[in-house]
C-alpha cells in the first residue's frame, strides 16, 4: 500500500515542481537569434522631436552579426513602412559585433553608420524595420504598434 500511495505523491510533487519551473522561466531566457539580424531599435529619439541633427542621430537601428565570421554588408538595405531605404556602403561587421544605423548626419565610424537624413524615419506610433539582403531576400523584420519608451528589442 505504501508504494501505491508514494508513487502518485511523488509524481504530483514532480509535476508541481516542473510546472513552477516553467512558470518561473523569464521571457529573456529565449535563445538569441542567429545570423545577421535586427537588434535594438530606438525609434523615438529621447526628448522632444526637434529635427535637430542631435535628435536625428539619437534615432537608430542596430544590426547584429551573431555568426563566427565577419560579414560584408555592402548592398544590404534597411527599410521602413513608408519606403525610406538605407543602403549599406562597403562595411564589414565583425563576428559577434553590432553596428548602429543612425538617422542623422555624421561620418561613418567603427560600429556607427549614418543615413544622413534631415528628417525622422521611424514612426513613433507604429512602423516596421526590414533588413534586406542585396539579392532582395528579406533577412529579418521587426515591428511595433505604439510608443513604449521609444525602443524595441528585436532579438
Located regions from the model:
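Short Gly/aromatic-enriched secondary-structure transition segments
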Residues: 74-80
Amino acid at each position: 500500500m505504501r508504494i501505491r500511495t508514494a508513487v502518485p505523491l511523488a509524481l504530483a510533487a514532480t509535476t508541481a515542481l516542473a510546472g513552477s519551473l516553467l512558470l518561473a522561466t523569464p521571457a529573456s531566457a529565449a535563445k538569441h537569434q542567429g545570423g545577421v539580424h535586427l537588434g535594438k531599435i530606438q525609434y523615438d529619439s529621447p526628448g522632444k522631436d526637434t529635427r535637430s541633427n542631435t535628435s536625428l542621430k539619437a534615432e537608430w537601428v542596430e544590426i547584429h552579426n551573431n555568426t563566427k565570421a565577419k560579414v560584408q554588408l555592402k548592398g544590404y538595405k534597411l527599410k521602413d513602412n513608408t519606403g525610406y531605404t538605407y543602403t549599406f556602403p562597403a562595411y564589414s561587421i565583425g563576428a559577434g559585433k553590432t553596428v548602429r544605423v543612425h538617422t542623422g548626419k555624421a561620418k561613418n565610424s567603427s560600429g556607427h553608420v549614418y543615413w544622413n537624413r534631415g528628417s525622422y524615419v521611424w514612426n513613433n506610433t507604429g512602423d516596421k524595420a526590414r533588413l534586406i539582403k542585396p539579392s532582395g531576400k528579406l533577412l529579418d523584420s521587426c515591428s511595433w504598434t505604439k510608443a513604449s519608451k521609444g525602443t524595441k528589442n528585436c532579438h
